[in-house]
Amino acid sequence: MSSSIEQKKGSTRQRKCGFCKSNRDKECGQLLISENQKVAAHHKCMLFSSALVSSHSDNESLGGFSIEDVQKEIKRGTKLMCSLCHCPGATIGCDVKTCHRTYHYHCALHDKAQIREKPSQGIYMVYCRKHKKTAHNSEADLEESFNEHELEPSSPKTKKKSRKGRPRKTNLKGLPEDSRSTSSHGTDEMESSSYRDRSPHRSSPNDTRPKCGFCHVGEEENEARGKLHIFNAKKAAAHYKCMLFSSGTVQLTTTSRAEFGDFDIKTVLQEIKRGKRMKCTLCSQPGATIGCEIKACVKTYHYHCGVQDKAKYIENMSRGIYKLYCKNHSGNDERDEEDEERESKSRGRVAIDQQLTQQQLNGN
């Protein structure tokens, strides 16, 4: 019995990314594995792959990307040799279109390429060391396009790259396999714009509909994440489940219902602000305010990422218990439930004593 468990653990440790063929989790992000165990890829290797884009379909996904698309990109990578290590799987191309340098993610780091990452806009770009200056010179153009304070690169000024600062989704389906495999940039025409929307959580910046301050998507995810509550005065919005399990939100009592999903709006806004510094264990995006209940555990999630990572949610409405245990600590919930029940009874007795004391004082 124990030997089979050890073998299973050993096989998990031996799994390698389909792109970089390594276990470099520290450099390349978490190694994500599909449910059928057939596809494995580092999150960063997928985010920066030139022809891979986010998927919002109901089919099984890997870190927000379609399993089918990841497999196609891994297959495309078998024909692309890395400019640094000369091994296949190098699907990350320099974002200067005329440049033929292509990398694995960790090789781009080692070759001192410039990594540009702006999760809030779905922008993930790489400039080889030769074209760093090009990226630096075009930062001002991008800042003007997005009207934000953070500086990110735009592409060099060429006729084909005139649409600056417009993240978009590229649909590669329906193209011949050869056209997807001949270049580290996917297809030339489809990569004529500088930016590729790789974020698993973001839609087009032209979409002005309210988005959840935690998971960054809108009402299209209401079925899975609960109603999207909107607070127009503060220009804030949040899904019910995202608020319910966030570590710092306060749900109001039945006698003082708020208009913002029964939550104290002040605590929701504070949590959204805190979430900007909290990156998700699964997808590495900000807004992950749902932490594992084990104090020594540092795992933190968006609501849907916790579900995808097989974390265990404890939801007991009658007792006001809403907790998450990561998959490594999901066995701790039963013991913790007993502790919580004892604490709840203790709090109930204290409340009754306080009420009796208050009645006695009022009687006097």
UniProtKB/Swiss-Prot annotation:
- Provide the primary localization: nucleus
Keyword list (alphabetical) reads: Acetylation, Centromere, Chromosome, DNA-binding, Isopeptide bond, Kinetochore, Metal-binding, Nucleus, Phosphoprotein, Repeat, Transcription, Transcription regulation, Ubl conjugation, Zinc, Zinc-finger
Q: What InterPro entries does the record tag this protein with?
A: EPHD, PHD-type_Zinc_Finger, Znf_PHD, Znf_RING/FYVE/PHD
Pfam families, per this entry?
A: zf-HC5HC2H
Which residues in this protein are found as Phosphothreonine?
T357
N-acetylserine: modified positions: S2
Residue positions of motif Nuclear localization signal:
13-16, 129-133
* Chain positions with Phosphoserine modification: S138, S145, S155, S183, S199
Please give the tissue specificity annotation from the record for this chain: At 12.5 dpc it is highly expressed in the embryonic central nervous system and at lower levels in other tissues. Very low levels present throughout the adult brain.
Where is this chain's protein located in or outside the cell?
Answer: Nucleus; Nucleus, Nucleolus; Chromosome, Centromere, Kinetochore
Record note on domains: The PHD-type zinc finger 1 mediates both nucleolar localization and interaction with UBTF. The ePHD2 domain folds as an integrated structural module comprizing the C2HC pre-PHD-type 2 zinc finger and the PHD-type 2 zinc finger. It mediates non-specific binding to dsDNA, but doesn't bind histones in contrast to many PHD-type zinc fingers.
Free-text function comment from the UniProt entry = Transcriptional regulator that associates with ribosomal RNA promoters and suppresses ribosomal RNA (rRNA) transcription.
UniProt protein name: PHD finger protein 6
What taxonomic classification does the UniProt entry list for its organism? Eukaryota, Metazoa, Chordata, Craniata, Vertebrata
Gene name linked to the record:
Phf6
